[in-house]
Amino acid sequence: EACPAGAVKLGQKLCDKEGCEITYPQMPLPGNQPWGEHMWSHNYRDVNRINCYDTGTAPCKTACPAHIGIQGYLQLAKEGRYEDALALIKKDNPLPAVCGHVCNRRCEDACTRGTIDEAVAIDEVKRFIAERDLNAETRFIPKKTIPSLKGGFEEKIAIIGAGPAGLSCAYFLALTGYKPTIFEKNAEPGGMLRYGIPSYKLEKDLLAAEIDVIRQLGVEIRCGVEVGKDVTIEDLREQGYKGFYAAIGCQRGRKPGISGENAEGAYTAVDFLRKAGAKESFALEGDVVVVGGGNVAIDAARISSRCIDAKISMFCLEAREKMPASNEEIEEALEEGIELNCGW
């Protein structure tokens, strides 16, 4: 087995009795081999998730769904260049503070430091950088890069839905010189970020602050307008809109297909969390049972404990160590007195 840094093992012999050097397996280091196009890998995101030498892409960045320049912003943060670090993050992620609260940290799962002791706290650093800016007197507004000598574009673009996808689409369009309009049927923008994630996990003021930055780029958000009901695509075409992006999300709960799933008091987790997030009036009576072992199930259980003083029980198929929920979420649920029943 070769060490990627060319090191020898403790107690490994380097010479024989005659004093001659003993060769041992060594992995070629990137600095010792010529670099050229023959070393490139155009499919690095699919085939290169451990060793980053062939492409120069670290495992953390490869594992990140947003493909953020993680090594770069960590180095900039180390140097105290927080605004530069935020600018680098926002090249790929328009909502870094939100992500810092709800990200499942695939980057940290792939971090090779974790093979020694613990992974680098990548998500916490991103969260610190983003929240530091939101709490400042003057917030960082990304610089636009308009691919036209004439300035911004006049074409009107309509985006249907102000959830993460719609906000991201508007953000990147605005950075290239467009002034898109988002049509949102709910009273507030954010989609499942606002109506599906409990406030104890994601503060709504923080979400609103990051959306305000997107507005400052020239994005218009019209809430309380349901496309297809209050206005149609044809109506928007007549108003001069040339492009459309449907970001309506997937906000319907999934039922397990068992008897009693439509009984009174039975909710899908998505519907339940939306009602709680929208502060709609609904009553919980008696003990609460949550079926599932993922993070959404834990969200439903923990928000239930805040709605009613009763026994909250979770039932899931998986063993404790196989539960889809993160260990952090599980531990916090247990600390709040939620009963966990595995292997059902």
Give the predicted meaning of each segment:
Residues 1-153, 204, 244-262, 338:
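Ferredoxin-type iron-sulfur electron-transfer modules and their immediate structural context
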Residues 242, 264, 286:
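Conserved acidic residues
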Residues 182, 186-217, 221, 276, ...:
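Rossmann-like dinucleotide-binding cores of NAD(P)H-dependent redox enzymes
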Residues 77, 84, 151-160, 208-258:
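Feature captures the FAD/FMN-dependent oxidoreductase FAD-binding
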Residues 159-183, 223-237, 252-254, 271-327:
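Rossmann-like dinucleotide/flavin-binding elements
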Residues 144-195, 201, 240-249:
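Compact, aliphatic and Gly/Pro-tolerant "microcore" segments centered on a short helix or tight beta-hairpin
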Residues 246, 268, 290:
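Redox-cofactor binding/interface segments in oxidoreductases and associated redox assembly factors
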Residues 258-272:
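A short, gly/pro- and small-residue-rich
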